[in-house]
């Protein structure tokens, strides 16, 4: 099922745009869950960082681990560089987030739905 970004809140759209920027900055063609989670954590006035801090999580450790995992992902040079597509894992997370949205009877997919889907 194609992802309907018109059903995303502004913050959720920004998270995907930021995730894409993270991937492109590292010459990575495949957009992964790690890119999205890092984007959610780094989001200005976002819920994810606040939630992790309230849970007592080591946020700097999580960010460091995400950066490390992202650095291990394949890089693309030359032809094809600059094009990004969603991995199967990330597509599954997006679909799970839409399921959460429907379960909660929300009209738009938010960062909360994405975070619930990632955590699941």
Show which residues each predicted segment covers.
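Histone-fold recognition with a strong bias for associated Lys/Arg-rich disordered tails
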Residues: 1-120
């Amino acid at each position: 099922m194609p992802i309907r970004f018109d059903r995303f809140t502004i913050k959720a759209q920004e998270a995907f745009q930021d995730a894409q920027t993270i991937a492109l900055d590292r010459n990575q063609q495949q957009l992964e869950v790690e890119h999205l989670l890092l984007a959610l954590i780094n989001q200005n006035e976002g819920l994810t960082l606040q939630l992790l801090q309230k849970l007592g999580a080591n946020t700097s450790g999580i960010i460091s681990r995400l950066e490390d995992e992202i650095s291990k992902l394949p890089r693309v040079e030359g032809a094809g560089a600059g094009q990004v597509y969603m991995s199967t894992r990330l597509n599954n997370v997006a679909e799970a987030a839409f399921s959460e949205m429907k379960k909660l009877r929300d009209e738009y997919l938010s960062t909360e739905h994405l975070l619930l889907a990632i955590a699941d």
